[in-house]
A protein has these predicted regions:
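Glycine-rich NAD(P)-binding loop of Rossmann-like domains
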Residues: 1-27
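Gly/Ala-rich phosphate-binding loop of Rossmann-like dinucleotide-binding domains
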Residues: 28, 32, 105-106
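C-terminal helix-to-coil terminal segments
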Residues: 1-6, 121-181
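Alpha-helical elements of Rossmann-like donor-binding domains used by nucleotide-donor carbohydrate transfer enzymes
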Residues: 26, 51, 55-58, 100, ...
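Generic structural signal for small/hydrophobic residues in well-ordered secondary structure
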Residues: 10, 15-19, 59, 81, ...
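A short helix-to-beta-strand connector/capping loop
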Residues: 36, 109, 131-135
Length: 181
């Protein structure tokens, strides 16, 4: 099988994590624990992204969405990646130019992509990414299990109680300009 040449021992795999928030930090720890070589770009220094994506087996996007990250993964970034590399997006869908991603995947300029998020969710049936063989798109329900549902229900009950007592809520999410969402 021609794919066997791409199977590497973990200690020979190189991964670039783009975005060093909660998700990025957890990924770094997990990947390093199994011997994968990891480099990190935080959200303040990703302007050199096109240069930094080279020579990695995996490029994992964990970026939040803001004015400076919108569509920062574009044709120049994808064509700078090695032909044997994979792109993974667990950040925000809008940080990726999907037309450019489609182009590089359709022309086999990179090996493949794994997306937990897309630009417009839910994904439309006519989205051209759905018809490629070298992409896997999850339905953005990675935490949808019985255990995660139990945790979410407990968190909701705790927050409901805190709300009725005029206490600050837990796990509040803020948008890019610092407003609660």
């Amino acid at each position: 099988d021609s794919n066997m040449e791409y199977i590497l021992p973990f200690n020979e795999v190189k991964c670039l994590i783009v975005g060093y928030g909660n998700i990025g930090k957890k990924l770094v720890g997990l990947l390093k624990s199994i011997g994968i070589k990891v480099d990190v770009i935080d959200k303040t220094n990703f302007q050199n992204l096109d240069k930094l994506v080279k020579n990695n087996n995996f490029v994992i996007n964990c970026l939040p969405l803001n004015n400076s990250t919108k569509e920062c993964f574009k044709l120049s970034t994808f064509t700078s990646m090695s032909s044997y590399s994979y792109f993974i997006n667990v950040g925000r869908g809008e940080t990726v130019n999907e037309k450019d991603l489609f182009y590089v995947l359709d022309n086999n300029l990179i090996r493949g992509a794994f997306l937990d998020v897309v630009q417009n969710e839910p994904i439309k049936k006519d989205n051209q990414l759905l018809y490629l063989d070298n992409i896997f798109i999850s339905p953005h329900i990675a935490n949808f299990s019985n255990k995660s549902q139990d945790i979410q229900i407990k968190d909701f009950i705790v927050n409901l109680s805190r709300y009725t007592q005029n206490k600050p809520l837990l796990n509040v999410v803020y948008n890019s300009i610092g407003e609660k969402i």
